[in-house]
Amino acid sequence: DYQAYAANLDKSAYSGNDLGASYSKKATTFKVWSPNAASVRVNIFEHGSDNEGDAGSIMSRAMSLDKTTGVWSVTINGDLLNKYYTYSVTHGKTTKETADVYAKACGVNGQRSMVVDLSTTNPDGWENDKHVLVQNQTDASVWEISVADFSSSESSGVSEANRGKYLAFTEEGTTVNGVQGASSTCVDYLKKLGVKYVQIMPFYDFGSVDESKNIMDQYNWGYDPVNYNCPEGSYSSNPKKGEVRIKECKQMIQALHNAGIGVIMDVVYNHLSLIHISEPTRHAQ
């Protein structure tokens, strides 16, 4: 019953920072906190969705429960870099397949998580990237923007391939309609105004946009999160590659910092895209 279920949650606690997939070339350890599950398996895939190549898993491993912490874990030997995975979680007689809520990378539409080495997603100069700070709070002029809205117009002066995407922020010298001497657009416009921070509307992975289709043919602000810790794929040049969306998101942040503009990430943990709490991989379309 609910009381027993909740009581078991209360007595299980884990303060570690290694939930998700911890990668090395020799092995990857998977950990997920699910104290009330009867069993958990991790399934490894070559691709991020059923629509790419062989849809079947290449391996599946049972995970072991630490009853003290409520953490299920398993270590798989070998190099799993950029392989995709899901968990099969059993509660009672029901088994659901789900992405990893702790994942930092995922495949198209967030249906499968991805094993990632974050150091390989760093753009050139990332080690020198720093937060933008102001001396006084009153100096913090903040503009709210959407990644898609920021450059989606044909008049933005941004190259067609980058319109509505992370990489639009990396283009310098953009003007209205690309006309030399015309008014500045995008990041150059923000610099001209003296904006110190941008609060970017959700750019975590959200469910209302089909990442396999052109972002210019769809629209949503993104307040329906699927994977809180993965960048949205529709804003990347290749949503099928989990590492690409991370690198290009970093490039956006780096470009803004280089322009003297700080970045505030709009995150809404009280919003969900789930149709039903027992269907973790299903989300509203």
Where are these regions (language model features)?
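Single conserved hydrophobic/aromatic residue that forms the stacking wall/gate
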Residues: 275-285
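Beta-strand signatures of extracellular beta-sandwich domains
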Residues: 41-43
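The feature marks proteins involved in alpha-glucan
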Residues: 1-29, 57-58, 66-173
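Aromatic-lined carbohydrate-binding/catalytic grooves of carbohydrate-active enzymes
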Residues: 152-171, 193-244
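Hydrophobic faces of well-ordered beta-strands that scaffold small-molecule active sites
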Residues: 141-143, 198, 263-265
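Conserved, mostly hydrophobic/aromatic
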Residues: 32, 87, 145, 200, ...
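Short proline/glycine-enriched turn/loop motifs at strand-loop junctions of beta-rich domains
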Residues: 34-39
